[in-house]
């Protein structure tokens, strides 16, 4: 079955949200980061957006089974052209696919299609992913991203034109 890694736990731990803030988990997968955040910040209202129907269904079922169905809403959709999510959000958190597309030297994707989609960039490269997240964010909102250190320059290039206050928190 699906197992969550440490990345979504660290992502959720880095989010600061005040009472009533709305948080989007962009590319939520099975909801691990959203559930960690909901457990830590019971006042937050969280929406998870996931392109893969099976993962979105599993995340929605998990929210209900864990008593979080009223605070964690899962929506199936594409970040590149999202459905109406009620944006803008106070916080957008995201754990984008870590693997660059194969044609960009990203290596061989996992053989299972769901994992390949979750782990490898597809129609949205990293810069497009970040720009899509920024479009869903309120003015002066927070974007929280977890990614590999070797992609830091790409991340900074994607946020620099529109973000003012940038903090990089190394995770060792």
Cite the ranges covered by each PLM segment.
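Mobile active-site "lid"/loop adjacent to the S-adenosyl-L-methionine
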Residues: 97-128
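Alpha-helix N-cap/helix-start capping motif
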Residues: 9, 31, 53, 149-150
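S-adenosyl-L-methionine
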Residues: 1-18
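Conserved SAM/SAH cofactor-binding pocket of Class I
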Residues: 14-86, 91-94, 99-106
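Conserved Class I SAM-dependent methyltransferase catalytic core
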Residues: 4, 122-172
